[in-house]
Amino acid sequence: MRCLRIRERRDLFAFPYPIAVWREPPRSLEVVSDLALSYGVEHIYTVGDVVTKNFLDYGVTPTSAAVDEKTRRGLPVEQHRKFQRVIKVVNPPGYITEEAWAAVEEAVGGGVLIKVEGEEDMLALAFIKMAPPRSLVVYGHYKGALIAVMVDWYRDAIDRLLQYLEKC
């Protein structure tokens, strides 16, 4: 993949797409777990420190995850022990670098924690684009919701959204 960055229409990327769960943990994770069970989800990918920590605390180890080791809540997050491999990448805010694309491509196979120097938020798009069928990508919305994206339902919409990103 190539490097992409947000140049305009940031509003399109801030909207809480697909399923927004406006509940605190552990209820939010129960809702997402029920959704995954109901639809036969085989892989769950998490993006974000708090989301990943909450899944692990609830006893659900994601297939793979991306974190930047920074949280708005200032919570310490240690999740590297649950993953077979750690990949470190540089990914500035608003970007998906080639290095980050490559890490996500490897991570969709499972067992990978991507540690991002910069910001991991945009990697949710890369996971949605590359995850296998029957996958769920979960991330936190800045206003407090847990967002769950059924990859099979939204991959085409994300492909269209990626067209708004500028090559870098």
Curated annotation (Swiss-Prot):
<keyword id="KW-0808">Transferase</keyword>
<dbReference type="GO" id="GO:0015937">
    <property type="term" value="P:coenzyme A biosynthetic process"/>
</dbReference>
<feature type="binding site">
    <location>
        <position position="120"/>
    </location>
    <ligand>
        <name>GTP</name>
    </ligand>
</feature>
<dbReference type="GO" id="GO:0016301">
    <property type="term" value="F:kinase activity"/>
</dbReference>
<dbReference type="GO" id="GO:0005525">
    <property type="term" value="F:GTP binding"/>
</dbReference>
<feature type="binding site">
    <location>
        <position position="50"/>
    </location>
    <ligand>
        <name>GTP</name>
    </ligand>
</feature>
<keyword id="KW-0342">GTP-binding</keyword>
<keyword id="KW-0547">Nucleotide-binding</keyword>
<feature type="binding site">
    <location>
        <position position="51"/>
    </location>
    <ligand>
        <name>GTP</name>
    </ligand>
</feature>
<feature type="binding site">
    <location>
        <position position="68"/>
    </location>
    <ligand>
        <name>GTP</name>
    </ligand>
</feature>
<dbReference type="InterPro" id="IPR007164">
    <property type="entry name" value="GTP-dep_dephospho-CoA_kin"/>
</dbReference>
<feature type="binding site">
    <location>
        <position position="70"/>
    </location>
    <ligand>
        <name>GTP</name>
    </ligand>
</feature>
<comment type="pathway">
    <text>Cofactor biosynthesis; coenzyme A biosynthesis.</text>
</comment>
<comment type="function">
    <text>Catalyzes the GTP-dependent phosphorylation of the 3'-hydroxyl group of dephosphocoenzyme A to form coenzyme A (CoA).</text>
</comment>
<keyword id="KW-0418">Kinase</keyword>
<feature type="binding site">
    <location>
        <position position="49"/>
    </location>
    <ligand>
        <name>GTP</name>
    </ligand>
</feature>
<protein>
    <recommendedName>
        <fullName>GTP-dependent dephospho-CoA kinase</fullName>
        <ecNumber>2.7.1.237</ecNumber>
    </recommendedName>
</protein>
<dbReference type="Pfam" id="PF04019">
    <property type="entry name" value="DUF359"/>
</dbReference>
<keyword id="KW-0173">Coenzyme A biosynthesis</keyword>
<comment type="similarity">
    <text>Belongs to the GTP-dependent DPCK family.</text>
</comment>
